[in-house]
Amino acid sequence: MEAPIVSVVTPFHNTSAYLGQCIESVQAQTFRDFEYILVDNCSTDDSGEIAERYAHLDSRIRVIRRNTLLSQVQNYNSALSELSPSCQYVKIVQADDFIFPTCIELMLRLFEQSDSIGLVSSYWLKGSQLRGSGFPHTTQILPGKEMARSYLRTGLWVFGSPTAVMYRSSLIEKGKPFYDESCLHEDTEKCMELLEHWDFGFSHQVLSFSRSDNESISSAVRSFCPESLDRYIVVQRFATRFLPSEEAVSLKQRTKRDYYRILAKRTFRLKQSDFWKYHNRGLKTIGESIEVSYLLRQMIRELLWMAMNPGRTIISILRLLTAKTT
């Protein structure tokens, strides 16, 4: 095929239940000038064979099969190393997600408005829920630092999963990992890094779908409150880069209090050791570990609140017991 403008990348591992739908959503794009790179991370189901069947019928598809099992983020970095030199834009589509037909076309329109735009996102569906709402409806392009400040101050989360974002390919340096392999939530942190130097585009259309019943994601991890850890790490790492010093200090303190309050609540639910290992592993990426004394103070505050609000406490306990028996 001729040199493509867009490289679409789908790394996968044992996603045979969803891979066909994912591939067909890319093939159905109204924008046609793309290559599609499917990278099999040592699947033990028939995902690799499914990918090969589609590649046999569509010359735009390349299938790469790894011999060594990689972690998820290593697999993504490995897949991004396979881009054609001619591509100008990169679209990741996770193997259990899919994109709607005008996704690439509408995102490209935004990139074409300004060479300063480094990444573009849009509304997306997480199961049946609309995500990405809150972006100013009269605006499509924001200076990167303004977008980062908005996220830090309000929690406006418009980056979504990797499937919701498209990147300018020049941001992916050959021979260097795109995502930080030490991070638990590498996609959010990568977006924040890019916003320090690049502007942000947003399409006010629903352009992608991410599963909420994803069997490839451990239900245990979903119960670990990953969003709270992600928010805490991003604020601690980036607040001083984008905000005035006094505001940054205040935000970091407030976010720490909120994060430890969530940990305190989970303590009363007798969370297993894997919960604490998960959070300690995440905190280690910013040179921290769980502060036991700070956690104890938050637990005392929670106990006082529970004592002063017996009605709500009883309701919470009943909900917890109901959840454990269903």
Residues of each region from the PLM?
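A conserved acidic beta->alpha catalytic loop
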Residues: 40-49, 68
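Conserved donor NDP-sugar-binding/catalytic core segment of glycosyltransferases
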Residues: 102-135
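Short, well-formed alpha-helical segments that are part of the catalytic scaffolds
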Residues: 14-28
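Short beta-strand-to-loop acidic/aromatic patch adjacent to the donor-nucleotide binding site
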Residues: 86-98
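Glycine-rich, basic loop-to-helix element that forms the pyrophosphate-binding segment
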Residues: 66-85
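Conserved nucleotide-sugar donor-binding catalytic segment
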Residues: 141-231
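Short loop->beta transition adjacent to catalytic acidic/histidine clusters or analogous donor-positioning motifs
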Residues: 3-6, 27-38, 46, 58-62
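Membrane-interface aromatic/basic loop that binds lipid-linked glycans or pyrophosphate carriers
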Residues: 266-326
